[in-house]
Curated annotation (Swiss-Prot):
<feature type="topological domain" description="Extracellular">
    <location>
        <begin position="419"/>
        <end position="603"/>
    </location>
</feature>
<feature type="glycosylation site" description="N-linked (GlcNAc...) asparagine">
    <location>
        <position position="566"/>
    </location>
</feature>
<feature type="transmembrane region" description="Helical">
    <location>
        <begin position="55"/>
        <end position="75"/>
    </location>
</feature>
<feature type="topological domain" description="Cytoplasmic">
    <location>
        <begin position="76"/>
        <end position="137"/>
    </location>
</feature>
<feature type="glycosylation site" description="N-linked (GlcNAc...) asparagine">
    <location>
        <position position="490"/>
    </location>
</feature>
<feature type="transmembrane region" description="Helical">
    <location>
        <begin position="321"/>
        <end position="341"/>
    </location>
</feature>
<keyword id="KW-0184">Conjugation</keyword>
<feature type="glycosylation site" description="N-linked (GlcNAc...) asparagine">
    <location>
        <position position="222"/>
    </location>
</feature>
<feature type="glycosylation site" description="N-linked (GlcNAc...) asparagine">
    <location>
        <position position="552"/>
    </location>
</feature>
<keyword id="KW-1003">Cell membrane</keyword>
<protein>
    <recommendedName>
        <fullName>Plasma membrane fusion protein prm1</fullName>
    </recommendedName>
</protein>
<feature type="transmembrane region" description="Helical">
    <location>
        <begin position="138"/>
        <end position="158"/>
    </location>
</feature>
<keyword id="KW-0472">Membrane</keyword>
<feature type="glycosylation site" description="N-linked (GlcNAc...) asparagine">
    <location>
        <position position="245"/>
    </location>
</feature>
<dbReference type="GO" id="GO:0032220">
    <property type="term" value="P:plasma membrane fusion involved in cytogamy"/>
</dbReference>
<keyword id="KW-0812">Transmembrane</keyword>
<feature type="topological domain" description="Extracellular">
    <location>
        <begin position="1"/>
        <end position="54"/>
    </location>
</feature>
Length: 740
């Protein structure tokens, strides 16, 4: 039966193919040429819609998402810029306050320094007074001990020696006086006898001599003997020793002289110390006060503006790059899609011949024609199996995983991952600039510390100059007199030694005691005086004062330590809030934006991954079902399986019944439709060779069906184009038989 216009009432979407026939009364359907005027889309019409292929659309959607992400990132960076500028302004104000701290702290530090100097000078005065008095009394005590000890030894030696000498002289004088008188008397008696005899002799001689007119004098020794009798040692023989004994020195003059001379320099030093340090007050106006500092580092070429401007330029550049790349990719995607459409069109034309042949499974033919690539992939994978049942299951699993809905889910997930990748690349480009901001923030801290160090160093230099001048003044006015007094004391000791030596020289000069006394003096006093002089010389060389100077980092040490690399706690930085774990507030703003975008990318990646996992789950469902049926033998009718599908038999005219009434039209109101008409019949084309003829059905065949035999299924004819098999020679034969 031919199609008629009344067929439109049965299936409104079915075209009136018989209307195209040259003679409507003929009983054959005229096939329309594919390149002519057809109700379906031709190649040119298909190619006109290549630009809206799925990959171009997905790439454009990715581009839109990347542009939205770039715009969102730019908006977030603008917000971060405002927050960073606000934080930078706060840091700038705090840095200016920190840099101005020397101005405020110097007043208190100056007062502390001045008070410390005054207290030190007051303590120095007390120490000097006590030291001078102690040294004065100590020197006098030592000298007094020395010369009094020497005086005791001297008196002992001299007086003992004089007393012994005077006693010896007196005894010797008394002995000599008594002995000489007795000797004189004895000599006088002897001389008188001799003189009488001698005079008598002389008288005889004179008698003779008178004859010659001469005379001999007589001997008279009485006067000499009287003199000898009256001879005695003079009483003045021990007057010198008595005088020496009575004239031993007591060194009272030396004592008075020494005390007068020694006390004079000490008293002068005390007087000068009292005059110089009596009411010493440090002049606080001499200490400097640094000026206030105003730091500006938030603006300018190295400020926050330049950083965020560079980030904005980077985002804009990245957006342009993504626009260019994705648009070019979307455009280039049209080329393979156009080639794919051309191949699909050719494949559809080739495989459309299957519709004109008798196919055992027309749905398979429709699937192969409508989904050429997925069907080809299934056939390619199924060709690796020799069992027809497994070939069917493999094709079914691939078809299940490549339905338009499943592929839409897969493409959506892949597009989401591609979008996340583009956003990640953009984020990585922005993250590379964060260390630059950290470096700039570190430079901000360095600027504050440098300003503090400069102010602190300038203040310390000026203050140290004042302290040095004060130390020099004290050394000249106070310790200068100490040096003078030590020199004078050394001179006094020399004078003491000279004076003592003079006294000894006047007393014992030219005597036997002079040398021993001088040796004792040098041993007992001279060596001690030399030791004292050495000590005074050391005091003279080291008597000066040096007040400790102020370090150059008085005001900057703490700030410099807080940003140093040795700081274990980043929150110690003076640019960080209390409790912050980041190094400062400025980089925290940018890091927060980066973390926000990163969280968004992570969320989108998870969503895209879940979408892909949904497709994987769908594919696994098909794979699991196919694997389950892989090892299950198909049950025949006798085992509870389904009935055998009868082949449509061609009648004598070559027509086949097409049950068009089996297709329900849910969009049409049943009341508006006319009653169903008999199903039309297709007329076989005279130019087409039927690939498969009707199989005569014997009674035995019907009996086999009743008994449950599956019978043969001619799947091979459904996959042949122009008599050639589309698969291997082992295509679909028997379920339970391997190919031969």
């Amino acid at each position: 039966m031919l199609f008629s216009r009344s067929g439109r009432s049965i299936f409104p979407l079915l075209p009136p193919y018989a209307a195209h026939a040259p003679n409507p009364n003929q009983g054959h359907i005229i096939a329309l040429p594919p390149d002519g005027l057809t109700p379906y889309l031709g190649l040119r019409a298909r190619l006109s819609q290549v630009w809206i292929n799925r990959w171009t659309i997905l790439l454009l959607l990715v581009l839109v998402r990347v542009l939205l992400a770039a715009s969102g990132l730019q908006a977030d960076m603008s917000t971060a810029k405002r927050e960073a500028l606000s934080a930078c302004t706060s840091v700038e104000s705090m840095g200016s306050s920190m840099a101005s701290m020397p101005h405020y702290l110097s007043q208190g530090v100056n007062e502390l320094t001045a008070t410390g100097v005054e207290k030190a000078v007051s303590g120095l005065k007390s120490m000097l007074m006590l030291t001078i008095t102690g040294v004065e009394e100590l020197v006098l005590f030592i000298i007094k001990v020395l010369y009094q000890t020497y005086l005791c030894l001297f008196t002992l030696a001299v007086r003992g020696s004089v007393h012994v000498a005077v006693g010896v002289i007196k005894e010797a004088a008394d002995f000599l006086n008594s002995t000489v008188k007795e000797v004189g008397d004895d000599i006088g008696k002897a001389v008188s006898t001799f003189e009488s005899a001698f005079n008598k002799f002389l008288d005889g001689v004179n008698t003779v001599a008178s004859a010659f007119g001469a005379s001999v004098p007589t001997l008279d020794l009485n006067s000499s003997i009287s003199t000898l009798e009256n001879l005695q040692l003079p009483s003045s023989i021990d007057q010198g020793l008595d005088k020496l004994n009575s004239s031993l020195p007591t060194f009272d003059e030396v004592n008075n002289f020494t005390q007068t001379v020694l006390r004079t320099p000490f008293e002068e030093v005390k007087k000068l110390v009292n005059e110089s340090l009596g009411t010493y007050t440090f002049d606080r106006s001499l200490l400097p006060v640094p000026a206030k500092e105003q730091l500006t580092f938030c603006e300018g070429s190295n400020g926050i503006d330049s950083f965020f401007d560079s980030v904005t330029d980077l985002v804009m550049k990245a957006r342009k790059i993504f626009i260019a790349i994705l648009i070019v990719a979307a455009t280039l995607a049209c080329v393979p899609m156009a080639w794919q459409e051309i191949r699909r069109w050719r494949s559809m034309k080739e495989r459309s011949q299957l519709v004109r042949k008798e196919a055992h499974d027309p749905m398979d033919v429709v699937y192969i024609v409508s989904r050429p690539y997925t069907a080809a992939a299934g056939i390619k994978a199924a060709s690796r199996f020799s069992n027809s049942r497994r070939q069917i299951l493999v094709r079914w699993a691939i078809a299940y995983a490549t339905t338009p809905a499943a592929l839409f889910v897969l493409c959506l997930g892949v597009a989401g991952l591609l979008s996340c990748l583009c956003q990640y690349l953009l984020l990585q480009a922005v993250e590379k600039t964060v260390p630059e901001l950290s470096t700039q923030v570190g430079a901000f801290a360095d600027k504050v510390v440098d300003s503090l160090q400069n102010a602190s160093a300038e203040w310390a230099n000026d203050a140290n100059g004042v302290i040095g001048h004060m130390s020099q003044d004290l050394n000249e006015n106070v310790f200068g007199w100490v040096n003078t007094s030590t020199t004078a004391l050394n001179d006094t000791l020399n004078t003491f030694v000279d004076k003592t030596t003079g006294v000894l020289n006047d007393t014992f000069g030219g005597t036997l005691l002079y040398e021993p006394l001088m040796d004792v003096f040098g041993c007992l006093i001279g060596l001690k005086v030399q030791g004292i002089q050495k000590g005074l010389t050391w005091v003279h060389d080291h008597a000066h004062i040096d007040f400790p100077l102020l370090p150059n980092d008085t005001f900057s040490r703490g700030a410099a330590a807080s940003i140093s690399s040795n700081s274990s706690n980043p929150s110690d930085s003076f640019l960080a809030d209390a409790g912050d774990q980041t190094s400062n507030k400025i980089t925290e703003v940018v890091i927060r934006v980066v973390n926000k975008v990163e969280d968004g990318i992570r969320t989108e990646t998870i969503i895209s991954g879940v979408i892909i996992l949904i497709w994987v789950f769908i594919a696994l469902i098909g794979i699991v079902r196919a694997l389950t049926l892989f090892w299950v033998r198909d049950r025949n009718r006798g085992e509870g399986g389904g009935a055998r599908v009868n082949h449509h038999l061609s009648d004598a005219g070559g027509f086949i019944d097409v049950p068009l009434t089996a297709v329900s039209n849910t969009n049409t109101d049943a009341r508006s439709m006319p009653p169903p008409a008999p199903a039309p019949r297709y007329e076989a084309s005279t130019s087409t060779v039927v690939a498969s003829r009707a199989v005569p059905v014997s009674s035995t065949h019907h009996e086999d069906e009743k008994l449950g035999f599956a019978g043969e299924r001619q799947y091979g004819s459904a996959l042949k184009v122009d008599g050639a098999a589309d698969l291997r020679g082992s295509s679909y034969v028997e379920y339970d038989m391997e190919k031969r």
